[in-house]
Structures are given as structure tokens and as C-alpha cells.
């Protein structure tokens, strides 16, 4: 019936016609994102069929739609990762020339702070965040990455696997209706090539945060820090406090839309 869509289908067993442009519903996006974040980024044929059957509870979908969604999602994830690494490298390079000057100024107490505050370049932070950076040591041990960074907001102000996921969405689908819609101009700036079949759902289930001053589009809920950034990085809030992760490398709390964060090397 739709020969063009069927010709590109990865040997689909679905009997329904494949729509050339599939706009998944919020409930379907939530399921797909949960599966992707659980580590299944390239499901085999039998898993694709299972996912498609689960998505059909909320609207028409074909195996090819599921296949291409995961293909596009992997591409976007790799692109965001490259953009973040490039932004981090550029930020570290731009502050390198001023590093020595900042540290000399701090050691000479030209920019004194009270006993309860220390200036790290992005506003005054309490002793709690200061102790995280200084570890009770002299200011000369502050990592150079923190010096010169500034926050646009000013000063400080379990995954149970694929099987449980399928079981959960078999009888708890009502929670999916709590999905909120966020519209962000940053998505079109960072991903101009995705303004086709994906344009209607990229903004659903996503939010925009600022990491090292760069607007980034991330998923709501738990984020796999280990997969996205590796074992040697820590994500900090603009207040200077590190975001805790569980034993599997997932953030224990969701990022907040519009907030500023910093990706820094883990201290040893």
C-alpha cells in the first residue's frame, strides 16, 4: 500500500502499512527513551517486534518505524556527545592563558572572601561546595577548569532491565500521560538536520540545560552519566555541588530544565 516506506523496511513482519512520516505519541516516546537509556540502543529483529507490539497500545506503528527511531536516536546521541566534548575542550583552552593570573591573585588575597564563602568564578558558594573543590587544601590546588567559568544564572542559589520494562508498561501505562511538552529553540540550532520526521517529537520527553555554557537537549529522568561522559567526569550544578550517581552510573535526580551545569574531570 505504501511501497516506498515498505521498500526501506528492515524485513518487517508487521501487517499494517508503514507510514513514511511517523509522529510517535508522548506515551510511545517515553517507552522508546526508557528502552534506549536502559542500554538497548540497537535492538535485534525479535526485540524490535516486541517493542512495536508494546507501542501499538498507544497508536499505529510498524517495525520499520521502530528500527529507524533507534537509528536516528543513536545518531543524535553521538552528535550531542561530540558537541559536548568540543565545548569542554574549547572552554578549557580559553581559560588556560588566564589560569596562572587567577591563581596568583587568589594566593595574594587580592580577592578575599568571607570565612563561609569562596569565589570560584561563578558566584559565591557556601563552605559545602568550597570544601568539595579545595578538600581542605590551599587555593593553589583548585583545578584550572573551574577558574574563569561563569554561570549565566549568577551565584549559588535503577534500572531493572528490559524484561521489567516490558512488564511495567503492560499495566502501568497511565503514568505516561504525565509527560510534559517543552519547546526549545536550542533544539533547532543544535540539530538542524533533524527538522523532518523527527521534528514533532524531539521536543517531547526532552528538556534544555546548559552544560559548560552550551545549550544541550537531554532526556527527562535518569541519565546514564557513565555512557554519555565516561567514568572520569563529574557533573556539577551551577551552585558548585556535584550531582550524585548510583552504582550503575545513573544520576539519582533528574536535571532541571533551563539550569546551568558544568562537566569537569573527576578529582582523584
Swiss-Prot record:
Biological processes per GO annotation: adventitious root development
GO cellular component terms, A-Z: nucleus
Positions of the UniProt region annotated as Disordered: 1-22, 173-198
InterPro entries per UniProt: HD (IPR001356), Homeodomain-like_sf (IPR009057), WOX11-like (IPR044558)
Summary of the function given for this chain in its UniProt record: Transcription factor which may be involved in developmental processes.
Keyword Transcription recorded: yes
PROSITE patterns given in the database record: HOMEOBOX_2 (PS50071)
Main location: nucleus
Protein name as annotated: WUSCHEL-related homeobox 12
Annotated Polar residues bias: 1-16
DNA-binding region: 17-81
Compartments (UniProt record): Nucleus
Keyword DNA-binding applies: yes
Organism name: Arabidopsis thaliana
UniProt keyword annotations, A-Z: Developmental protein, DNA-binding, Homeobox, Nucleus, Transcription, Transcription regulation
Amino acid at each position: 500500500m505504501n511501497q516506498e516506506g515498505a521498500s526501506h523496511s528492515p524485513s518487517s513482519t508487521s501487517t499494517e502499512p508503514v507510514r513514511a512520516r511517523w509522529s510517535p505519541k508522548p506515551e510511545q516516546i517515553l517507552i522508546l527513551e526508557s528502552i534506549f537509556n536502559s542500554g538497548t540502543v540497537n535492538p535485534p529483529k525479535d526485540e524490535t517486534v516486541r517493542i512495536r507490539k508494546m507501542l501499538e497500545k498507544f497508536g499505529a506503528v510498524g517495525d520499520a518505524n521502530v528500527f529507524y527511531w533507534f537509528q536516528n536516536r543513536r545518531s543524535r546521541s553521538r552528535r550531542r556527545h561530540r558537541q559536548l566534548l568540543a565545548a569542554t575542550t574549547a572552554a578549557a583552552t580559553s581559560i588556560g592563558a588566564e589560569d596562572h593570573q587567577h591563581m596568583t591573585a587568589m594566593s595574594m588575597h587580592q580577592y578575599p572572601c568571607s570565612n563561609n564563602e569562596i569565589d570560584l568564578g561563578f558566584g559565591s558558594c557556601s563552605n559545602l561546595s568550597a570544601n568539595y573543590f579545595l578538600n581542605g587544601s590551599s587555593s593553589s590546588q583548585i583545578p584550572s577548569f573551574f577558574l574563569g567559568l561563569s554561570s549565566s544564572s549568577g551565584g549559588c542559589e535503577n534500572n531493572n532491565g528490559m524484561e521489567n520494562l516490558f512488564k511495567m508498561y503492560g499495566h502501568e501505562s497511565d503514568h505516561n500521560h504525565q509527560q510534559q511538552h517543552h519547546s526549545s529553540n536550542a533544539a533547532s540550532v543544535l540539530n538542524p538536520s533533524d527538522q523532518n520526521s523527527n521534528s514533532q517529537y524531539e521536543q517531547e520527553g526532552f528538556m534544555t540545560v546548559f552544560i559548560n555554557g552550551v545549550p544541550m537537549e537531554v532526556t527527562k529522568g535518569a541519565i546514564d552519566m557513565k555512557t554519555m561522559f565516561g567514568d572520569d567526569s563529574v557533573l556539577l550544578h551551577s551552585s558548585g555541588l556535584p550531582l550524585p550517581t548510583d552504582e550503575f552510573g545513573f544520576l539519582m535526580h533528574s536535571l532541571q530544565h533551563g539550569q546551568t551545569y558544568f562537566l569537569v574531570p573527576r578529582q582523584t
